[in-house]
């Protein structure tokens, strides 16, 4: 019985060491991305670290810190009062062209809630009077929580090379409530 207990203890310690190493790797990668101002990538690593449920609050604190940085560096507020967008409907938000010197470091910050009972994709398109400059897709999870989406739009060539004046959101196969949408920049 003692041998079995010792084996179980060793196995448990090995599992804890593996989780600890994985957590430390995610935190290290998140911190590197944070220092490089790649906030979207930093959040991915911090989210993975938080999902390990180690009891540490650091990953959540860093995600909140990034969200605060982005909100403090807001360039354009596109949604401040909640709006709903029905499935497969498109809603366009207009703004003045962003200063060319800050475009490469731009993010779109969206706080949104899934109003449907399934996960789905949402298309984010952007452009100007000349037409559509580009688009990307984000996954909307199957939960009814308000989720933060931080999209590094400045990494897209047509975002920083064109004078874009609108962003469109199109939820595909699900309804969504947008509580906040801003164009922001890393500090």
Segments from the language model and where they lie:
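Alpha-helical tetratricopeptide repeat
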Residues: 19-34
């Amino acid at each position: 019985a003692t041998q079995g207990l010792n084996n179980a203890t060793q196995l448990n310690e090995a599992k804890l060491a593996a989780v600890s190493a994985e957590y430390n790797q995610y935190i290290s990668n998140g911190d590197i991305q944070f220092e490089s101002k790649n906030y979207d990538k930093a959040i991915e690593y911090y989210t993975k670290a938080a999902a390990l449920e180690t009891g540490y609050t650091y990953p959540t604190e860093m995600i909140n810190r990034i969200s605060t940085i982005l909100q403090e560096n807001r360039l354009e507020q596109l949604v401040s009062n909640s709006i709903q967008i029905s499935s497969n409907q498109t809603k366009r938000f207009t703004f003045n062209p962003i200063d060319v010197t800050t475009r490469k470091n731009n993010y779109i910050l969206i706080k949104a809630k899934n109003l449907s009972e399934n996960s789905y994709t949402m298309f984010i398109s952007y452009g100007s009077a000349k037409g559509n400059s580009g688009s990307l897709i984000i996954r909307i999870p199957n939960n009814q929580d308000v989720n933060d989406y931080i999209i590094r739009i400045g990494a897209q060539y047509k975002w920083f090379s064109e004078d874009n004046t609108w962003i469109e959101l199109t939820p595909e196969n699900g309804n969504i409530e947008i509580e906040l949408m801003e164009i922001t920049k890393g500090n």
